[in-house]
């Protein structure tokens, strides 16, 4: 029997999703270590330069998540309906289309790199480092997209542990290459070295996953003659729209964070939000990893119309994420100084600003965990419209309104409160939508 077809209790669900959670936490940890290398060996301003380019990174990530989550939902549903041949055909088509999109996007970044760097607001201090990092993003952006595909598709193929192992290898490679490329005593490549290290490390799961689906034909999923049903790609993109919208929203709001905090605290403000976003990436990885792990199970149960298991999986998930989010909030507040010290010295002019910002923003996690799961739920149920509505509401509409109103009303603390209030409004909307569709999907 397909591993997705068995009945899941809390222990079984945790066993299946834990490799994905650990994989995402490790990948985020390696990203944080990457930032620590840059801050220590290149400088705090170089770290701020990376944050200037983060919106482009988020756009590339949005493409990867759109294809991976939307495509995996379709593959999971087809497997649940015992349409394994169609699932294999769609898998092949998904890879081809993703490759074409990556090539086009990389060309655009490399051709217009100077204009993009200026557009993102890099001043004379940050411009050169920001440009150098953007070029590496353009060269290696495709690896991020295919790493997203690898993470989701290996879970759908019933191989989450393989994804976890690849995550460990990729991360360790990133750390080693960071030291070799960035260290003044070795290659001394500066901020470009960080970009090359990340790109090469991301290539490991991307290439390995591709080879797995080429040669491992004993499993349900492997590359087959590509489907000619291009409509399925549009359905996958539509279904993964919430992830696309979510990351595009992060790109927009990160740009707004940079502009507003530069107004209040110049480059110290950009340094502070950079540190906070690095730490938040690690904490949010727990929620993201769980959602990636549970998504194929939800899609499969929905495909086979197993409503009792669908209800059980959703109920367990909501309780688990609520408990984890509370733990994350407590850790963030109690150890805010220690977390900030991973990047900044205590005597840094941006230190106290980062500590206060982290302590306030962390309150949003209880609402964020619920919002992310409900949005992921509707993606898994192949309802991209509702999923996108929830994503764009919480991460763009509510966030932009809060970023405009709160800093104007109460100053710089309004910047830190904006995510908390935006996620709260998003939670109210998610709860309403979740209950409205309860009887449509019988969960």
What do the predicted segments below correspond to?
Residues 1-17, 75-142, 186-241, 298-364, ...:
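Short alpha-helical transmembrane segments in multi-pass integral membrane proteins
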Residues 5-42, 55-70, 74, 99-106, ...:
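N-terminal transmembrane alpha-helices
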Residues 15-34, 136, 170, 201-205, ...:
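Transmembrane helical elements of multi-pass membrane transporters/channels
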Residues 20, 24, 36, 73, ...:
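Transmembrane alpha-helix boundary and packing residues in multipass membrane permease domains
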Residues 29-48, 117-124, 180-189, 251-278, ...:
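Helix-terminus/linker motif at the lipid-water interface of multi-pass membrane proteins
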Residues 47-107, 144-163, 272-330, 334, ...:
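Small-residue-rich hydrophobic transmembrane alpha-helices
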Residues 59-62, 174-178, 206-210, 282-285, ...:
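Hydrophobic transmembrane alpha-helices of multi-pass small-molecule transporters
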Residues 68, 137-155, 163-171, 194-209, ...:
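Short runs within selected transmembrane alpha-helices of multi-pass transporters and secretion channels
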């Amino acid at each position: 029997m397909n591993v997705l077809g068995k009945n899941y209790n809390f222990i079984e669900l945790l066993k299946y999703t834990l490799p994905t959670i650990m994989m995402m936490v490790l990948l985020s940890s390696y990203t944080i270590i990457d930032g620590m290398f840059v801050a220590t060996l290149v400088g705090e301003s170089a770290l701020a330069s990376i944050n200037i380019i983060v919106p482009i990174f988020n756009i590339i990530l949005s493409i990867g998540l759109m294809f991976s989550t939307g495509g995996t939902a379709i593959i999971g549903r087809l497997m649940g309906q015992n349409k394994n041949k169609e699932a294999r055909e769609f898998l092949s088509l998904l890879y081809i289309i993703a490759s074409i999109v990556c090539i086009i996007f990389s060309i655009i970044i490399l051709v217009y790199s100077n204009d993009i760097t200026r557009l993102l607001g890099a001043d004379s201090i940050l411009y050169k480092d920001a440009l150098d990092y953007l070029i590496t993003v353009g060269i290696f952006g495709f690896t991020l997209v295919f790493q997203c595909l690898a993470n989701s598709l290996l879970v759908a193929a019933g191989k989450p542990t393989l994804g976890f192992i690849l995550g460990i290898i990729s991360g360790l490679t990133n750390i080693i290459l960071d030291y070799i490329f960035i260290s003044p005593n070795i290659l001394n490549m500066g901020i470009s070295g960080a970009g090359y290290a990340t790109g090469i490390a991301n290539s490991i799961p991307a290439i390995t996953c591709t080879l797995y689906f080429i040669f491992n034909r004993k499993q349900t999923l492997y590359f087959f003659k590509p489907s000619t049903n291009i409509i399925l790609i549009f359905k996958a993109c539509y279904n993964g729209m919430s992830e696309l919208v979510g990351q595009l929203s992060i790109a927009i709001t990160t740009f707004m964070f940079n502009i507003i905090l530069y107004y209040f605290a110049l480059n110290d403000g950009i340094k502070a939000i950079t540190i906070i976003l690095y730490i938040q990436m690690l904490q949010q990885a727990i929620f993201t990893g769980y959602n990636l792990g549970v998504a194929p199970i939800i899609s499969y149960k929905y495909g086979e119309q197993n409503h009792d298991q669908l209800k059980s999986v959703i109920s367990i998930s909501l309780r688990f994420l609520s408990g984890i989010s509370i733990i994350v909030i407590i850790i963030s507040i109690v150890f805010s100084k220690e977390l900030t010290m991973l990047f900044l010295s205590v005597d840094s002019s941006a230190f106290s600003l980062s500590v206060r910002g982290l302590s306030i923003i962390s309150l949003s996690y209880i609402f964020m965990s619920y919002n992310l799961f409900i949005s992921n739920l509707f993606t898994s149920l192949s309802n991209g419209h509702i999923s996108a509505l929830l994503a764009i509401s919480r991460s763009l509409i509510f966030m932009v309104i809060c970023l405009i109103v709160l800093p104007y009303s109460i100053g710089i603390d309004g910047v830190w409160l904006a995510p908390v209030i935006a996620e709260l409004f998003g939670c109210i909307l998610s709860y309403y939508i979740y209950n409205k569709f309860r009887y449509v999907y019988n969960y």
